[in-house]
Structure formats: C-alpha cells, structure tokens
Amino acid sequence: MKHGKKFKENAKKYTPTNVYELTEALTLVKSMAYAKFDETVDLSVKLNLKKSQTVRDTVVLPHQFRGEKKVLVFCKPEKEKEAQEAGAAFVGADDLIEKVKGGWTDFDIAVATPDMMKDVGKLGMVLGRKGLMPNPKTGTVTFDLKSTLAELKKGRVEFRADKSGVLHLAVGKVSMEPSQVAENITAVMTEVKRKRPVDVKGEFIQTVSVSSTMGPGVWVAIKDQDKE
C-alpha cells in the first residue's frame, strides 16, 4: 500500500517496532493526525481465539464522541409510550416492519421486544446486511426499553472479534484528550477480558494497537491488560 508524503513524515515521529504505554501511544496518534477532518481513533486487538470461538458484547464508553444516534424500536402498542419517552426516534410494529421490508433504513440502531422477533427476524435481508438486526447478545432484544435506550444514548457500542480473532473498534476522535480516549479503551479492554473463553490457554490478549483514520498504527503495552 502506497502512503502519501504527510503519512511518511508523521511516521518518522515514532519507532514502528516500539511498544508504548497507552496514553503515550494516544498522544503520538494525535500528533500524527494530519487530515482536514477530525479523524477517528481506532483500536485493534488480536485475541488468542480458536476459529470456533468468538468474543462479542457491548460496552458503554465513558466519553461519547459521536452525535446522538437514531434508535428504532419494534414493539407492540403497550410498549410504545415507554419507547417514545425513552427517546426512540421511530416506534411501531407492523407498520415499521413493512417500511423496513421496502428498504428503508434511516436509523442507526434497531431494538425489538422479544415478542416482536418472530416478525422482525424476517427482515434479515435488509437489517442483517447493514448490521442492524436486533440481537439478544448485544442487548437489543429486550422488554426493558427505558434502560436500554438510556445506555445507547450514553454511548453503548458493540464489539466483536472477526474470524481471525481481531477486534476493531472506534474509540474516540483525535480532537479529544488522550486521557479521555484512554478511558474509553480501558472500558473496552475490561469487557473484552471478561469475555475470555474458559478454555483459552496462555495469553488471551496478544497485541493491541491504536491508530487514527489516516495515520500509522502504534503498538500499546498490554502487560496490565491480560492479568487474571
């Protein structure tokens, strides 16, 4: 992959093979960001997982960095008021299902009550492709709409390792203080560690790196991230 002049100049600010403490790594990432837009800070974690294993959950980040998301709630009439008062942008049942079935996806997150999943599950061709399908594993299939929407508005995000055991997640913006992004990463790593499969032998967290949208990756020390 070819990189531009600014990328190469910024890459000289650090040693690619070095491993840095978290806040120091994030300070470097911030100093190497050069795009005219507010670059996202990305976290990459390589986990010791078998192909049959996965790590997936949600976490509320202490410092939100994205605008408020539009939440759609599939529920029956008796739960509509709760969803609306909790701040859902769209609430409904069969009417919304038909609208989504037609290809409409002008929302960021979909939540459904369990009694709606029989019908919502038929929207896989639309919601599944966009990663919007409600799922019990991510807490988006629930009767507790009030607390679920409150967490989503606070910045709850989903993390999931891919088939090669690598977890990628946006954790902040370069305009944020490195300490704030560090707190977001610590929250993520705490939850990742809790999801460690019981039969994993050796180190669970193998490598951690951070980067900005347009910048190089910086290795992060993990000696304190993998203790039992």
What are these regions (language model features)?
Residues 75, 171-173, 212-214, 222-224:
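Flexible glycine-/small-residue-rich
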Residues 51, 65-67, 77, 162-165, ...:
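Short flexible coil/turn linkers enriched for glycine and charged/polar residues
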Residues 37-41, 195-207:
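Flexible, glycine/charged-enriched surface loops at secondary-structure junctions
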Residues 20-81, 108:
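Translation machinery proteins
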Residues 25, 83, 128, 210:
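Residue-level signature of catalytic and energy-coupling elements of molecular machines
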Residues 1, 220-228:
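Short, charged, intrinsically disordered terminal tails
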Residues 1-15:
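Generic N-terminal amphipathic, Lys/Arg-enriched alpha-helix
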